C-alpha cells in the first residue's frame, strides 16, 4: 500500500486544504486532488434519503453492488485500480497557486469551506465500497484516490455531469 502524507489538512478549523491541479472545461474551473481513503466517508455524502428520485443528481445507491467492489479491493491489495470520484461542492472553493507556478499556475492548494456539502456525482458505489473496506482493513486509510471537484451549479448541471 502506498505510504503518503495526508493530503487534506484542516485550515483554521474552517476549511479543508488539498494539494490540487486546476483545470478548465467549458469556461468553468475544476480541480483534481488526491484524497486519502480515510477521509472519503466523512467528506462525501449521499443524497438518496433526502431528495426524491426525480430531483437527484446521481443514481440510487444499489447496496448489492458494494460487496463485490469491497471484495475486489480486499482481494487485490497490491493490484486494484479505481478511477476518480467526481464531486460537486455547494460552498466556497479557493485555489491558491504555489508561488513557484505563478499567479496563473495550475498547481496549488485548494481550500474548501468545511460547511460546504460535497456531493458525489459519479463514484458513489466506489465511495461506499471504500468505506466498507476500511471497516475490515483500517490500514487502507492511507491509500489515495483522485477526486475531481466542480463548483455546484445546481441540480440540472449535476445531473448532466453524472449522465455524461
List PLM regions with ranges.
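Basic- and aromatic-enriched surface patches that contact anionic nucleotides/nucleic acids
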Residues: 77-93, 98-164
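N-terminal extension/subdomain marker
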Residues: 1-82, 90-99, 107-110
Amino acid at each position: 500500500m502506498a505510504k503518503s502524507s495526508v493530503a487534506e489538512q484542516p485550515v483554521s478549523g474552517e476549511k479543508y486544504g488539498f494539494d490540487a491541479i486546476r483545470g478548465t472545461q467549458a469556461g468553468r474551473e475544476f480541480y483534481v486532488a488526491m484524497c486519502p481513503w480515510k477521509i472519503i466517508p466523512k467528506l462525501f455524502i449521499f443524497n438518496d434519503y433526502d431528495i426524491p428520485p426525480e430531483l437527484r443528481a446521481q443514481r440510487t445507491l444499489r447496496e448489492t453492488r458494494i460487496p463485490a467492489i469491497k471484495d475486489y479491493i480486499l482481494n487485490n491489495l497490491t493490484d486494484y485500480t479505481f478511477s476518480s470520484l467526481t464531486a460537486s461542492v455547494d460552498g466556497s472553493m479557493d485555489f491558491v497557486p504555489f508561488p513557484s507556478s505563478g499567479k496563473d499556475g495550475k498547481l496549488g492548494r485548494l481550500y474548501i469551506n468545511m460547511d460546504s456539502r460535497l456531493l458525489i456525482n459519479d463514484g458513489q458505489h466506489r465511495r461506499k465500497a471504500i468505506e466498507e473496506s476500511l471497516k475490515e482493513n483500517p490500514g487502507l486509510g492511507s491509500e489515495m484516490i483522485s477526486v475531481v471537484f466542480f463548483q455546484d451549479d445546481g441540480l440540472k448541471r449535476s445531473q448532466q455531469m453524472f449522465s455524461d
